[in-house]
Curated annotation (Swiss-Prot):
Function: Cell wall formation. Catalyzes the addition of glutamate to the nucleotide precursor UDP-N-acetylmuramoyl-L-alanine (UMA).
Name of the protein in its database record: UDP-N-acetylmuramoylalanine--D-glutamate ligase
A Pfam cross-reference name: Mur_ligase_M
EC number: 6.3.2.9
Species annotation: Paraburkholderia phytofirmans (strain DSM 17436 / LMG 22146 / PsJN)
Domain of life per record: Bacteria
Record key words, sorted: ATP-binding, Cell cycle, Cell division, Cell shape, Cell wall biogenesis/degradation, Cytoplasm, Ligase, Nucleotide-binding, Peptidoglycan synthesis
Family, as annotated: Belongs to the MurCDEF family.
UniProt record, GO biological process: cell division; cell wall organization; peptidoglycan biosynthetic process; regulation of cell shape
HAMAP family associated with the record: MurD
The gene coding this protein: murD
Length: 504
């Protein structure tokens, strides 16, 4: 289960760094397969320490700052995705491990090695992988549903939870290994993957997020690109220039399919068609295509005739139950992924119509007196809020602010100017958002609480508008998390409805 390096080792010593959900899963997996364990966490008493003991895992636990001393006798380092490789106490440890030839793997690499080992017994599932700054969970959940509707046994895991190795252990124990794995993967998880080769994978978008963890946008984008193996079908968002830099080289045998909110121009690509006031999900087809194989590389000076493209209408966008153009793009990505592994189209289109979306992701929670109240509390970065504004495409009173995580808020200016009636600012970094939007001419007011901001937004909104909570920030300056922030917003909207004699 641990690759060629450990094939002849009976009980290799593994150092697990970090005892979060993935760290605990890695510890359980390694213990299950007879490894000796040392578990280290910067916290003296991490919350999962009792769980480690409850599972009867014989591991030496070390709490406190990391140091290279932890490597004594270690043959493999298993690092949790929450730990930045740039952390001051982690850099010398990782450097020492590499100098000593000790592999540094994350949970995704352990999962990849396990699938390879199971493959020796004939297990050959399809693997679909999803990453991106925003839209991962929606696209992952939707892709899993589509696979089910096509009659496949599916396991959905990864960043979406449960942990990859926990889901794999459960499948092995129940002798119910799935036909298809659908994995939501963060840049953190991809950073320490080395042999991961999914059948199809998508990068939905790349915008500013977790830059402190990676050290910069280029490193963050490079981590996202690790989702593709040499033979992986690459599903790419053609509307995102950073994503398109991940397109395969011209001489590569890798297949690429694109999607976007624009009309597709190339055979096999997906997009949106606007016709007579309706928006359609479509796929481009070359009318002149033959069944003969087309060479990947063109000869020098070869004249290529532009394809004669027709657009096949798949379904109206308003047949989707998830709101916004960005969610239409997520639906196209999910459809493209499932088609890329050979699933039939008809049941997939039925599945697209069925999916209701995920909580706190551009979720309509009420319409009161003609005003929509939309919960996008999961919009914790600028890219998510830009997508929500452009996706809803209606007049909006925006509620934004919180812990900005060092982001540049300038990209908010254009969509705010286009769509917003006003902006209600909350949280620690409200002044930074105000500074970024000061030249838009849009009215902005500061509020001490989310409740106050929601009521002020209601007073300004007109019928046909939306009051949108999409903070572009993390929540921890004011709330326990984004779900707590959403609960406060919903509670306030419920109070407003009750005051107006309406139930939601």
């Amino acid at each position: 289960m641990f690759g060629e390096k450990f094939r002849d080792r009976q009980k290799p010593m593994v150092l697990v760094l970090g005892l979060g959900e993935s760290g605990l899963a890695m510890a359980r997996w390694c213990a299950r397969h007879g490894c000796r364990l040392r578990v280290a966490d910067t916290r003296e008493v991490p919350p999962n320490l009792p769980a480690l003991e409850a599972h009867g895992i014989d591991a030496a636990f070390v709490g406190g700052p990391f140091s290279p001393v932890l490597l004594e006798g270690v043959e493999l380092v298993a690092i949790s995705p929450g730990l930045s490789p740039l952390a001051a106490d982690l850099v010398p440890l990782i450097s020492a491990a590499r100098e000593q030839g000790i592999p540094v793997w994350g949970e995704l690499e352990l999962f990849s090695q396990a699938l390879k080992a199971l493959g020796e017994s004939g297990y050959a599932p399809k693997v679909i992988a999803i990453t991106g700054t925003n839209g991962k969970t929606t696209t992952t959940s939707l892709t899993g549903l589509l696979c089910e509707r096509a009659g496949k046994k599916v396991a959905v895991a990864g960043n979406i939870s449960p942990a990859l190795l926990d889901k794999l252990s459960e499948a092995i124990d129940n002798t119910a290994l799935p036909d298809v794995w659908v994995l939501e993967l963060s840049s953190f998880q991809l950073e320490t993957a080395h042999t991961f080769t999914p059948d199809a994978a998508v990068v939905l978008n790349i915008t500013q997020d977790h830059l402190d963890w990676h050290g910069g946008l280029d490193a963050y984008a490079a981590a996202k690109g690790r989702i593709f193996g040499a033979q992986t079908v690459r599903v790419l968002n053609r509307d995102d220039s950073r994503v398109m830099k991940l397109a395969p080289a011209e001489d590569s045998e890798a297949e690429m399919v694109t999607f976007g909110v624009t009309e597709p121009k190339n055979d096999g690509d997906y997009g949106l068609l606007r016709d007579n006031g309706m928006i359609w999900l479509v796929q481009a087809h070359d009318r002149d295509a033959t069944d003969e194989p087309v060479p990947k590389r063109r000869r020098k000076n070869e004249v290529v005739t532009p394809p004669n493209i027709a657009l096949k209408r798949l379904m109206p966008a308003d047949a989707l139950r998830i709101r916004g153009l960005h969610n239409a793009a997520n639906a196209l990505a999910a459809y493209a992924l499932t088609r890329a592994i050979g699933l039939p189209g008809a049941p997939l289109l039925h599945g697209l119509r069925e999916y209701r979306g995920e909580p706190h992701r551009v979720e309509l929670i009420a319409s009161i007196d003609g005003i929509d109240y939309v919960d996008d509390s999961k919009g914790t970065n600028v890219g998510a809020t830009v997508a929500a504004l452009d996706g809803l495409a209606q007049r909006i009173v925006l509620i934004a602010g919180g812990d900005g995580k060092g982001q540049d808020f300038e990209p908010l200016a254009a969509p705010v100017m286009r769509w917003c009636r006003a902006v209600m600012l909350i949280g620690r970094d409200a002044p930074l958002i105000r500074a970024a939007l000061e030249d838009t001419g849009i009215a902005m007011t500061d509020h001490a609480t989310l409740e106050e901001a929601t009521r002020a937004a209601t007073a300004l909104a007109e019928p046909g508008d939306a009051v949108l909570l999409s903070p572009a920030c993390a929540s921890f300056d004011m709330f326990k998390g984004y779900a707590h922030r959403a609960a406060v917003f919903r509670s306030t909207v419920e109070d407003i409805a009750a005051e107006r004699g309406t139930m939601i």
